């Protein structure tokens, strides 16, 4: 009996130490997760959307250039980018398949717009992961997958344009006025349209104005040290550049 018990103890100890390296090896596999990143961003077909008074709607397209589907949520905000605007986008939520393009429609929900000048809103498109987008673990290697989903929210300008406005961007650019105010220069917009300015150059200086635009009948004050001659890069409705020297 003594010999039998001694044999059993030795056998148990032998199998215990044989198992330890295996357990340690499995632990190392679990401690090294696979990191998978997915970016839920979309390509928008324009930099701004123009809604003309009395039109039933306007539209724009979006494209999913990723290799996986993306859920899309849309919302229109007022100029403050927080309160809801009198527009809806249809469909407000949709699934865009991989490498697919679709068109969204913007519809007004009110007619209480300023009839004398343009109004600015923000059209925001957010890409989010589908609810069932869960990666399964590799059970054979006992490997843990760490999925990181990067959600993006792209906002572009939505401009309401009354019927009374018929000036082209070139005509608006010709109407801008420059006035010196102390040691700085003020750019005045005497029109009822928004003026989108991508860049300003003066001598060796190059800079932008706050928000990138001048509102109707508004102005932008340039920093001190700017020369009397400046060059503006103005964007039209399609995002094309118009260069003007003043």
From Swiss-Prot:
Belongs to the periplasmic pilus chaperone family. Its main location: periplasm. It holds the Pfam family PapD_N. Disulfide bonds join 124-155. It comes from Salmonella enteritidis. Keywords: Chaperone, Disulfide bond, Fimbrium biogenesis, Immunoglobulin domain, Periplasm, Signal. Required for the biogenesis of the SefA (SEF14) fimbria. GO terms for cellular component: outer membrane-bounded periplasmic space. It is found in: Periplasm. Residues 1-24 form the signal peptide. It comes from the Bacteria. Transmembrane segments: none annotated. One of its GO terms (biological process) is chaperone-mediated protein folding. This is Chaperone protein SefB.
């Amino acid at each position: 009996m003594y010999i039998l018990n001694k044999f059993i103890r030795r056998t148990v100890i032998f199998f215990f130490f044989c198992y330890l390296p295996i357990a340690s090896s499995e632990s190392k596999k679990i401690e090294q997760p696979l990191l998978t990143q997915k970016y839920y961003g979309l390509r928008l077909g324009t930099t701004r959307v123009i809604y003309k008074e009395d039109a039933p709607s306007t539209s724009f397209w979006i494209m999913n250039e990723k290799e996986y589907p993306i859920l899309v949520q849309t919302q229109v905000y007022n100029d403050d980018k927080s309160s809801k605007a009198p527009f809806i986008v249809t469909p407000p939520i949709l699934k865009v398949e991989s490498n697919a393009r679709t068109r969204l429609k913007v519809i007004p929900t009110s007619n209480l717009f300023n009839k004398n000048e343009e109004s600015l809103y923000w059209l925001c498109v957010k890409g989010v992961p589908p609810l069932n987008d869960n990666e399964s673990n590799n059970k054979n290697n006992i490997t843990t997958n760490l999925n990181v989903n990067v959600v993006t929210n792209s906002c572009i300008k939505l401009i309401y344009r009354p019927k009374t406005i018929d000036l082209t961007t070139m005509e608006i650019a010709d109407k801008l006025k420059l006035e010196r105010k102390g040691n700085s220069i003020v750019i005045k917009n005497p029109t009822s349209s928004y003026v989108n300015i991508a860049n300003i150059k003066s001598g060796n200086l190059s800079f932008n104005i706050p928000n990138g635009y001048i509102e109707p009948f508004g102005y932008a004050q340039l920093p001190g040290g700017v020369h009397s001659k400046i060059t503006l890069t103005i964007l039209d409705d399609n995002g094309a550049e118009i260069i003007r020297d003043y």
